[in-house]
Curated annotation (Swiss-Prot):
Record protein name field: 4-hydroxy-tetrahydrodipicolinate synthase
Keyword set, alphabetical order: Amino-acid biosynthesis, Cytoplasm, Diaminopimelate biosynthesis, Lyase, Lysine biosynthesis, Schiff base
A Pfam family reported for this protein in Swiss-Prot or TrEMBL: DHDPS
Family: Belongs to the DapA family.
Biological process according to GO: diaminopimelate biosynthetic process; lysine biosynthetic process via diaminopimelate
Function of the protein: Catalyzes the condensation of (S)-aspartate-beta-semialdehyde [(S)-ASA] and pyruvate to 4-hydroxy-tetrahydrodipicolinate (HTPA).
Residues under site feature: Part of a proton relay during catalysis: 42, 105
SUPFAM superfamilies named in the record: Aldolase
C-alpha cells in the first residue's frame, strides 16, 4: 500500500445512511487522485452502525468505486468472531483488503492479539491492514507482535500506525518490511521520512488533491515541497481533533456543502466556539466559497 487513503465519513440523512451522498463523496475523492478509500472505520462512525448497515455500506462502497481505486473496509471488533464475520463478508463482496483495529475495552495480551489477528488471517485471503490506535483502544500492538504477525501470515501486509511514538515506528520499520501508513495526518511526513508509505487521512476528505500532492512529493524524496503543503494544511490537521473524530470533519464537510449530515449519538454537534475556529481555518485555506 502506498499513497493517500481517506478514512471516509458515513453521511446520514434523517437518521439513515445517505447512499447518494456517499457516492458523491467517493467520486470526488477518486477524481482527486487518492489511492483508495477506507469505509466504516472510526471516521465512518462504525460503532453506531447496525451490523446490517455496516455490511451494506461496505457493499455499496465496492459498487460505487467499481474498481477505480482500492477499497479497504473497516471490519475490526473487540470480538474475534464478529471481526471474522465482517471480514469474510467484506471479502465476499469484493473489497481489496480489510482494516482490523486492535480489540478495544477488553484489552487482550500480546499473545491474545497474535491469536485474534491470526485466526482472521487464516480465514480470509485478502490483505489485512492492522490498525494500532492506543488512544482509543488503551492497548498498543508492540513492535515484536507486529513483526511476528507480518512474518507468520502472508496476507498481513500493512499497518495503520496511530501511535504517535516515532520510536515505535522506527522499531517496526527496522525489523520487517510491513507497509506502514500514518494514522495521524500531522505525522505523515515524519513517518514517510522513516520509510512509511503514506497515510490513512481524515483531512483528505476535504483536501484530497493537496494531500495526494504532499504524499507524492514525500515518497519521491522532495521533502521541501512536501513541507510547504504540510504547513499549509497543518492548522486544519490540528482542528480535526479539537473534538472527537469525526465531529470536526463532518462539521467541515457540512460547511463546505459536501454530503455529511448529522452525527449519531452519543456523538453530537460541535461547540460553537470550535465551529468558528474551523470556519476561519477553511476560509484561510480558500476552501469556503
Amino acid at each position: 500500500m502506498q499513497g493517500v487513503y481517506p478514512a471516509i465519513v458515513t453521511p446520514f440523512k434523517d437518521g439513515k445512511v445517505d447512499y447518494d451522498g456517499l457516492r458523491t463523496n467517493i467520486d470526488y475523492l477518486i477524481e482527486n487522485g487518492v489511492s483508495g478509500v477506507i469505509p466504516v472505520g472510526t471516521t465512518g462512525e462504525s460503532p453506531t452502525l447496525t451490523p446490517l448497515e455496516h455490511e451494506k455500506v461496505i457493499e455499496k462502497v465496492v459498487e460505487f468505486v467499481d474498481g477505480r481505486v482500492e477499497v479497504i473496509a473497516g471490519t475490526g471488533s473487540n470480538s474475534t468472531s464478529e471481526a471474522l464475520e465482517f471480514s469474510q463478508y467484506a471479502e465476499d463482496v469484493g473489497v481489496d483488503g480489510v482494516l482490523l483495529i486492535t480489540p478495544y475495552y477488553n484489552k487482550p495480551s500480546q499473545e491474545g492479539l497474535k491469536r485474534h489477528f491470526g485466526e482472521i488471517a487464516n480465514s480470509i485471503n485478502v490483505p489485512i491492514v492492522l490498525y494500532n490506535v492506543p488512544s482509543r483502544t488503551a492497548l498498543n500492538i508492540e513492535p515484536e507482535t507486529i513483526k511476528y504477525l507480518f512474518e507468520e501470515y502472508s496476507n498481513i501486509t500493512a499497518i495503520k500506525e496511530a501511535n504517535p511514538n516515532l520510536s515505535q515506528v522506527s522499531e517496526v520499520l527496522d525489523s520487517c518490511n510491513i507497509d506502514v501508513l500514518s494514522g495521524n495526518d500531522e505525522l505523515t511526513l515524519p513517518i514517510i521520512s522513516l520509510g512509511g508509505k503514506g497515510v490513512v487521512s481524515v483531512v483528505a476528505n476535504i483536501a484530497p488533491k493537496e494531500f495526494v500532492q504532499m504524499v507524492d512529493f514525500a515518497n519521491a524524496g522532495k521533502f521541501d515541497k512536501a513541507k510547504e503543503i504540510h504547513y499549509k494544511l497543518f492548522p486544519l490537521m490540528k482542528l480535526m481533533f479539537i473534538e472527537t473524530n469525526p465531529i470536526p470533519i463532518k462539521t467541515a464537510m457540512n460547511m463546505l456543502g459536501m454530503p455529511s449530515g448529522e452525527l449519531r449519538l452519543p456523538l453530537c454537534e460541535m461547540a460553537e466556539s470550535n465551529k468558528l475556529k474551523l470556519q476561519n481555518a477553511l476560509n484561510n485555506l480558500g476552501l469556503l466559497k
